[in-house]
UniProtKB/Swiss-Prot annotation:
GO cellular component: mitochondrion
Designated name of the protein: Pentatricopeptide repeat-containing protein 2, mitochondrial
Principal cellular location given in the protein's record: mitochondrion
Keywords: Mitochondrion, mRNA processing
GO biological process: mitochondrion organization; mRNA processing; regulation of mRNA processing
Family, similarity comment: Belongs to the PTCD2 family.
Start-end of each PPR repeat: 157-191
Listed InterPro entries: mS27/PTCD2, Pentatricopeptide_rpt, PTCD2, TPR-like_helical_dom_sf
Gene3D superfamilies, sorted: Tetratricopeptide repeat domain
Free-text function comment from the UniProt entry: Involved in mitochondrial RNA maturation and mitochondrial respiratory chain function.
Length: 381
């Protein structure tokens, strides 16, 4: 019932001509347009782990051994012999071309056929194969392989699907990306935080009533199941809602973001306020961001020129025009208006997450002994 009501509500907002007129000026601003050739991956190195994969490949890339390994597995394929786990793992690390990957895929099919009812243990071959496709730029082969009925169950992990979707997004193969998402749900693979972000990014890029409906449906489904929707996913949903002339939904999505202090969130907030006509609030946000006493090493809030141009246009001829122009001039002088587009802010490759360095085992033991002695001393006192 909820999804049915959502479908009806979506059709209403998309066909409401009077509401669309309110946003016409904002859409003409060319906001959210991706610059030509600006293709981005959305997953961080922590997820893709390409560097780690390449380091492991280096230990296997010895030409005289590579040919030998491929000869062995080809002979096993011809004789219908069982492929061992170690052989498949070594083979995947030995692939250097598209032709090698095709052979590896055939070996995977044989391996999966022999081990369909056997658990692979902790090691997952799916992400390894997808990282190989990622490295060699074989996104279409990756998509075809992960949807192959003969390999159902082999790619049982979320990471394999996420890496595939990320590759397809980078090559602007958005419809193929949605097909992979459909296969993911069909196989019962759970959607992770990264999956929601990737799917909403694809829906945002497609910007159609169908993609908007998919975004709304998955968002409702995720919230109903108690999934954690990441901030970046909400930002893509907000951008798509604005492109679909749905200010009400954009505001609702924004209200779900717990921490809105990022540059992207602040730009989206000003954009929403400008389209809404809330000039007083928009000016307050910009005025608050204009902090001349900010230390040199602290990065000042920046706003996209696309966003401030929408604000200028919306305030033109009104009582707030002069005040808007005044605060924008001050921001311009402070270097807080940037040429970076909203699409650039949305579609970026995140940096690797910082991890605290772990102490060696010996140091940890010393710290534990020190802590115990301190506790004993306190008890004696």
């Amino acid at each position: 019932m909820a999804l049915q009501a959502l479908n009806i509500w979506t059709r209403v907002i998309l066909t409401d001509a009077s509401r669309a007129a309110v946003f016409r000026g904002a859409l003409q601003s060319h906001c959210f347009k991706c610059r030509h050739g600006a293709k981005r991956f959305l997953l961080s190195e922590d997820v893709v782990k390409l560097e780690e994969f390449q380091q492991k490949k280096l230990s296997h890339e010895m030409s005289q051994l590579k040919d030998y390994r491929f000869d062995i597995v080809n002979q096993k394929l011809e004789k219908n012999e069982i492929i061992l786990k170690t052989e498949l793992k070594t083979l995947l690390h030995s692939c250097q071309s598209a032709e090698d990957v095709i052979v590896a895929r055939n070996v995977i099919k044989r391996y999966h056929e022999n081990n369909r009812t056997t658990a692979f243990g902790e090691f997952k071959f799916g992400p390894l194969f997808m990282r190989l496709c990622y490295e060699l730029g074989l996104e279409e082969l990756a998509a075809t392989t992960i949807k192959d009925p003969a390999l159902k169950g082999f790619f049982s992990d979320t990471t394999s699907f996420n890496i595939t979707i990320d590759m397809l997004f980078n090559k602007q193969l958005y419809e193929s990306g949605l097909e992979v998402v459909g296969e993911m749900k069909k196989q019962g693979v759970s959607l992770s935080r990264d999956t929601f972000m990737l799917v909403f990014a694809i829906c945002y890029k497609l910007n159609t009533s169908r993609s908007y409906h998919i975004c709304l449906t998955l968002l409702e489904e995720g919230q109903t199941k108690g999934n954690i929707i990441p901030r970046r996913a909400y930002c893509f949903a907000i951008a798509l809602a604005l492109k679909q002339n749905d200010l009400e939904r954009a505001q609702i999505f924004y209200s779900h973001i717990m921490s809105t202090g990022t540059r992207l969130c602040q730009n989206l907030r000003v954009f929403i306020l400008a389209v809404k006509g809330s000039m007083k609030e928009a000016v307050y946000v910009l005025k608050t961001a204009r902090i001349s006493e900010t230390p040199v090493l602290v990065r000042k809030p920046e706003f996209s020129r696309e966003v401030v141009n929408v604000l200028r246009r919306k305030s033109a001829g009104g009582v707030w025009e002069e005040r808007v122009e005044q605060v924008l001039t001050q921001l311009e002088k402070a270097g807080q208006i940037t040429e970076i587009t909203l699409d650039d802010l949305l579609c970026y490759t995140p940096s690797r997450k910082r991890r605290l360095l772990e102490l060696p085992q010996k140091d940890r033991q010393i710290k534990q002994r020190t802590r115990k002695s301190l506790q004993s001393g306190l008890l004696l006192e």
